[in-house]
Amino acid sequence: MSNIAIECSNVSIRYVTGDFKSIGLKEYVIRKLTGNYKVKEFWADQNVNFELEKGEMLGIIGSNGAGKSTLLKAVTGIMLPTEGEIHVNGTIAALLELGSGFDNDMTVRENTYLRGALLGYTRKFLDEKYDEIIRFAELEEFQDYCFKQLSSGMKSRLAFSIACLVHPDILILDEVLSVGDGAFRKKSGDKMQEIIQGGVTAILVSHVMPQVRELCTKILWLDHG
């Protein structure tokens, strides 16, 4: 059995703006008829290569707009690369955007089960993990609050707790560890150390270099793709 968890080979990702997919069919037809139709394209990532073995942690760094989040979306299967191939061996829990996978009008309790279900876990498993998730997120007093009533730090804590405590094969975090107060950042960093020692493969996008150096076994630097 292969020990490779993620293999990214010559991956390039192109965005196209101005076509009917991005502006809508009606606007596309109007622009075509009036001669005001231009298609622009840019490459968010170009010829990206990396290989990550099980139990390793990759840190992805780079300035804003360098293509970090786009690459993560391709690794998780949210979007397909324009060129190249990505092979993933294992289940993925991903925190790509704050609040993604949650319903603003549902309670913290309901959202915990919803998010867990989206990650593929059973009600029985989530029943067993629920109290631990809420304790780690420090949201014991907010279980019946609507998600939209939480602060950004609370939302991040809940998302991180669910992803880390359901034991995925691969954990992908986009700037999540930088949200929240200092005490929770330390606690989440300690949890990441525990996760890696337990054999989980992880990818972390972060602007905090000391955090990347401390946690990651490999680093990928992206510079405008």
Give the location of each predicted region.
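Conserved ABC ATPase "signature" C-loop
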Residues: 224-225
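The feature captures the beta-strand-to-loop junction immediately N-terminal to the Walker
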Residues: 61-63
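Conserved ABC ATPase "signature" region
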Residues: 26-33, 113, 125-142, 161
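H-loop/switch region of ABC-family ATPase nucleotide-binding domains
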Residues: 206-207
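A short, surface-exposed alpha-helical micro-motif characterized by mixed small hydrophobic
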Residues: 212-214
